[in-house]
Amino acid sequence: MAHSNAYDVIIIGAGPAGLSLARSLAGTTLKVAIIDPASEQTLKNPPPDGREIALTHYSKELLQEMGAWDAVPEGEIFFLRSAKVVDGTSPFELHFETPDKARGKPADTLGYLISNHHIRQSVYSQVEHQANLTWFTEQKVQTVGATPEQAHVVLTSGEKLTAALVVAADSRFSTTRQQMGIPVD
């Protein structure tokens, strides 16, 4: 029979955003749950998915503070020297060049380009055995909802979780967000 588990924060999705949030809560007294349909082995060694993430200098600092930056293979960090932003058929575009300074320090790059799976792997390595963090791997969210008192999540296994806060970090096509009626423009 399913039983209730109370948490302070439930994070739905173990991608870069969900894992980074979990890592940022390390060292607190908060009881955190993280739910993801992938297996523990897949989270530990995610396969390449063809996505590359452009990181700012601030994102690099955050990953450094988490201890995750050094876990990214050095040969897999690529430097961005410039960028161009276009919007469909619009004749307008934005150009960004390497600034002289970034975050108050001399800069030799606009930012960094790293494969999504390397970011996931590096941040996962920092949260894998984190205290006060419970993993629900190979699980999907069946339903999610909220009352003024708390949020509740039911997993496909039938297990029921409650928390003061549920974070929908389950992709830009978040089914959690859709179930909660949160629009995206």
Predicted regions and their residues:
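Conserved N-terminal helical subregion
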Residues: 78-179
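Short glycine-rich hinge loops at helix-strand junctions in the catalytic core
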Residues: 29, 67, 132
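N-terminal Rossmann-like FAD-binding beta1-loop-alpha1 element of flavoenzymes
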Residues: 6-34
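N-terminal FAD cofactor-binding segment of flavoenzymes
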Residues: 47-88
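Short, flexible hinge/linker loops that cap or flank conserved catalytic cores
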Residues: 2-4, 160
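Glycine-rich FAD pyrophosphate-binding loop
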Residues: 26-51
